[in-house]
Amino acid sequence: RLDKDTSGLIVIAKHGYAAAVLSKSIEKEYTAVCEGVLKGEGTIDVPIRLKEGYTIQREVAKDGQRAVTHWKVVGGTNHHTLLQIRLETGRTHQIRVHFSHIGHPLAGDDMYGGRLNGIGRQALCCSKVLFVHPVTGHRIELACPPQDDMMALVQ
């Protein structure tokens, strides 16, 4: 599953058995553009919960569910940073909430503090999916490049 306006890869199972197997073995990597300049790599380990009074928006809170995001800088400019991201947990809006929490919201993510300059959606792409084929047992790796609207922010 991907958030609305997140681009990239999705895997659709044709049968319930395949869906059950895939849900336990699928790994995803994301590419994102955040505002500001980050260096190196890091881990964000703060819990997330549904924001009180909202039906979809999330927030960082001590009583939330554990959420862990690993990130690495792969490029950028003086205004934006291009990131490669791997989730240890898979909470709704996890990447968006975590980067907003550390003061670097995703570009275009107006729900979590990002500015809409140059992009009309959050700058987030599911760029790699890895899974074990439910019938053959072969490891499958799918990849796609980030979309042009995202890359324009870091060139």
For the regions a protein language model found, what residue spans apply to each?
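RNA pseudouridine synthases
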Residues: R1-Q155
